[in-house]
Amino acid sequence: GMSGPCVVLISDGQHQFVDYQACSDYRQLSGAELIDKIRQAGIAGLGGAGFPTAIKLDPRNTSIDTLILNGTECEPYITADDRLMQDYASDVVAGAELLAFILGEPSSIIVGIEDNKPDAIKAMQAAAKNTRVKIVSFPTKYPSGGERQLIQILTNKEVPSGKLPATLGIVMQNVGTAMAAYRAVRFGEALTWRITTLVGEALKVERNIK
């Protein structure tokens, strides 16, 4: 076989967090500085793909007019994003505002949520009051949580085959990703936790855990 570089990581066993570098007013920083904070915190897409968020927030030479947060979670049995939006609605909305600032304040900021999540919708509507963030619910139908499908549902635009949403002036992030980005910038938190759903016959109690 072919040889290649190898990196060996050896833990010191101390389990110590780095010192948090909080930022009380991110609007005093440039978009590039904020993207770097998000990169250094290891924020990646929490909708499943795990794509680095910093890269997605830097659509070079492209003007973004629509930011979409995906709160659809259309897969069966999974309710982690539903729980997240109920318990951390204000952080999700703050994350939407942060991402919009980084992207140059797009004219439209939308959070898309399927209508089978009434408690999450109510919490998000309350948190988004007096902001530019618009909460949009729509009929529950798989696979509406897919990036291209959700874009078509919310904007009536179809992303061409082989193209990225940014070519239409659209950036989409998961609701959990938006919250993680906000907490990385505001509190200096690295991405070390998330809410996830545990289900199955082997469990006495099926639940969401943090």
Regions found by a protein language model. Give the residues of each.
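Histidine-anchored nucleotide/phosphate-binding helix
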Residues: 86-102
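Hydrophobic alpha-helical positions that pack around
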Residues: 106, 110-210
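Acidic low-complexity segments
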Residues: 2-46, 51, 61, 118-119
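Gly-rich Lys/Arg/Thr-decorated short loops/hinges at beta-loop-alpha junctions or inter-strand turns
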Residues: 16, 67-81, 202
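Flexible glycine-/small-residue-rich
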Residues: 9-13, 71, 137, 200
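Short coil/turn connectors at secondary-structure junctions
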Residues: 3-5, 33-34, 40-41, 62-65, ...
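Short, charged, surface-exposed secondary-structure boundary motifs
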Residues: 18-19, 78, 144-149
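Mobile "lid/hinge" segments at catalytic clefts and subdomain interfaces of large enzymes
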Residues: 58, 69-73, 181
